[in-house]
Amino acid sequence: MASPCLIAVLVFLCAIVSCYSDNPIDSCWRGDSNWDQNRMKLADCAVGFGSSTMGGKGGDFYTVTSTDDNPVNPTPGTLRYGATREKALWIIFSQNMNIKLKMPLYVAGHKTIDGRGADVHLGNGGPCLFMRKVSHVILHSLHIHGCNTSVLGDVLVSESIGVEPVHAQDGDAITMRNVTNAWIDHNSLSDCSDGLIDVTLGSTGITISNNHFFNHHKVMLLGHDDTYDDDKSMKVTVAFNQFGPNAGQRMPRARYGLVHVANNNYDPWNIYAIGGSSNPTILSEGNSFTAPSESYKKEVTKRIGCESPSACANWVWRSTRDAFINGAYFVSSGKTEETNIYNSNEAFKVENGNAAPQLTKNAGVVT
């Protein structure tokens, strides 16, 4: 029989190395060497609040063969043509591609944009991805970087809506406005004019997982502004992501709503890691936070818009089983009792924070 000391060592090694080689999303599909023969199985693998997202499952495959872009009258074979069709589509790519869009790409509902098997880059100095009043969208294995602002101009929003004049956009990588059931998984996002992901204007049922966020200051905004009450119903899961290197703040920054931040790995931040205003509920569980070297940047959290500490004392911000490195610390507040936030289809196992580096080792694009 193994000695108690040996068992303790094995448990420790398991926690940090071998026993958490895959998180529950990756173990759902990546272990199958023939995943490309059953691409749509991916839609069964989401967890958290976006777990019901089907994307283009059950629809036809659509193959992008051209990097061209016509914002008003897209041609078959281009990404914009597939993304704006009314029917469910699973969009794949015929080869490696660098796509510079001329105007924001509106993604219609029931779409999967699946970059697996190719090296797909979006942005490159042009505007990027936009979703408005749609549901069931999956974005997977895309490099999205260098997204820039756009000017006022006409854009095909979808087959049913047609062409509309679109206001100038800020240069986000991914914008979601009044979107339900969306899953953003295994993308690499960096270096855009504004944010990397914005989830606003009543969006809910969102999972953001296995992404790599780096070389960017304002990473992720959840909630429109402090006066937009519809965001009180927002529910977002942020899990298994790698934040950094060189990620400044907003990982995420929430207004209202409920945000579960689980098993993410944080490199040193520039200002703060997790922040919010307007009384969001933030449940931090099993994350690994490595603080910057500066003593005044050690706090993980930042409460915004509080006239005094007592003004935010009832906000429910809770840290459970997080790992804190180099002096990092989380300031909790509000009620601390456990709550069951997920139904049986949404729930997933969250490991202790010391396992987060291993669970996020494959974050970002997979091919």
Curated annotation (Swiss-Prot):
Protein family membership: Belongs to the polysaccharide lyase 1 family. Amb a subfamily.
Claim: Lyase is one of the keywords in the record: yes
TM helices/strands, residue ranges: none
Post-translational modification: N-glycosylated; consists of complex-type N-glycans containing the Lewis a antigen (Galbeta1-3(Fucalpha1-4)GlcNAcbeta1-).
Residues with attached carbohydrate: N148, N178
Region (IgE-binding. Binds to IgE in 5 out of 7 patients tested) residue spans: 92-104, 251-258
Needed co-factor(s): Ca(2+)
Tissue spec: Expressed in pollen (at protein level).
Residue numbers spanned by region IgE-binding. Binds to IgE in 3 out of 7 patients tested: 317-327
EC code: 4.2.2.2
Species this protein is from: Juniperus ashei
UniProt lineage: Eukaryota, Viridiplantae, Streptophyta, Embryophyta, Tracheophyta
Identification of the protein by name: Pectate lyase 1
Renumbered residue ranges of the record's region Beta-helix: 38-305
Family annotation (Gene3D superfamilies): Single-stranded right-handed beta-helix, Pectin lyase-like
Active site: R250
InterPro entries in alphabetical order: AmbAllergen, Pec_lyase, Pectin_lyas_fold, Pectin_lyase_fold/virulence, PEL
Keyword ATP-binding among UniProt keywords: no
Phenotype when changing H224A: Reduced pectate lyase activity
Signal peptide: 1-21
